[in-house]
Regions:
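WD40-repeat beta-propeller superdomains and closely related acidic/aromatic-rich repeat-like regions
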Residues: 1-342
Length: 342
């Protein structure tokens, strides 16, 4: 006897196979059964559309707003430029990190990120500070400069008011902050910190809240928060990946890796982590996805060159069908199923 809904099952299998066979698949629409499905190559971003030359030195990081209307760029010169993406005109030029007295060689901005509602932009700098700016009018919302080592990364929670910050300071490696400041605590500036992970420390007569984690000293190279705001993942300079429950603020897992970690990202559903690692012996970038709960490696992408610089990657495309990675070979690599289209 033919199973119930057998025809529907077969037709669904045909649609799934057409998606798998589509090299440039970049749509969330269900393929039609009336014609063979194939996304056009010309609809895939393979060519340079414009060049932005307002940075005066190396560009270290860029980020699009969630609605795609803005692009923020940052780099070695300490500038943060925000462009509108229709005509690619600058709408803001932020110089907050230039005003730090650390000197021109220590003012580089290594990370920027828009809040989920695109109201705020956080920037992290080598001059040991982070700044949150209001994208609408350009005014500074909050700032923290109490760190003794560079601030390397940040990630927003869904409420667009709280965010986590990772630094290379063993005293303040990982913290949860809010844009709503509190002047209590006797610190040198308003206290925007809600919670911190790391070794015990005190500020004046006040002991800041710490977790009960026993990870010892660590320094953070990158940090990511799941889209639902329940989990956080951090990559450290001693090649560890640590995940945390942001509700209980307790550590969930820790996985030791072989070499230097340069970036980490959650997939949209939070089930995967995308990890970049610098294989120093081979001068190659290693890029793979892993189960965010078990740490099991699921897929590896080969081909990116990495020796000296920080290489980052992210999920991209409709339905996150692709992995996009930088490369020291001056290539942007789009990986769909383990191969590289460069």
């Amino acid at each position: 006897m033919i199973p119930e809904h057998r025809l529907a099952t077969l037709l669904s299998s045909v649609q799934e196979q057409q998606i798998l066979n589509c090299q440039y698949h970049n749509t969330t629409a269900t393929p039609s059964l009336y014609t063979d499905h194939e996304c056009a190559e010309q609809d895939f971003p393979l060519h340079t559309l414009t060049q932005l030359k307002n940075q005066t030195d190396e560009v270290w990081f860029l980020a699009f707003s969630h609605d795609g209307s803005l692009l923020a760029t940052a780099g070695k010169d300490g500038l943060v430029n925000v462009y509108e993406t229709t005509r690619w005109k600058i709408v803001h030029e932020f110089r907050e990190h230039e005003r730090n007295g650390a000197g021109p060689d220590a003012r580089g901005v290594c990370f920027v990120a828009f809040s989920p509602d695109d109201k705020y932009l956080i920037s992290c700098s080598q001059n040991c500070e982070f700044v949150v700016l209001d994208v609408r009018d350009g005014h500074m919302v909050c700032k923290a400069d109490h760190f003794d080592y560079p601030v390397t990364a940040a990630a927003w929670l869904p409420d667009s008011l709280t965010f986590v910050v990772g630094t290379q300071s063993s005293k303040d490696p990982l913290g949860l902050y809010t844009v709503i400041g509190s002047t209590s605590g006797g610190g040198p500036s308003p206290n925007y910190e809600i919670h911190s992970w790391g070794p015990p420390r005190s500020d004046g007569n006040r002991e800041r809240e710490r977790d009960r984690d026993t990870s010892g000293d660590f320094r953070v190279t990158d940090v990511a928060v799941s889209r639902d705001g329940t989990r956080m993942a951090a990559a450290t300079t001693d090649n560890r990946i640590m995940t945390y429950d942001l509700t209980s603020r307790e550590k969930l897992c820790e996985w030791q890796q072989e070499d230097k970690l340069t970036s980490i990202n959650y997939s949209a559903d939070g089930t995967l982590l995308l990890v970049n690692m610098n294989d120093t012996e081979m001068n190659m970038g290693r890029l793979w996805t892993m189960d965010s709960t078990t740490g099991e490696e699921l897929m590896r992408f080969e081909g990116a060159q990495q020796a000296e610089f920080v290489i980052r990657s992210c999920f991209g495309g409709a339905g996150e069908n692709f992995v996009i990675s930088g490369s020291e070979g001056q290539l942007s690599c789009d990986s769909g199923s383990g191969g590289l289209d460069c």
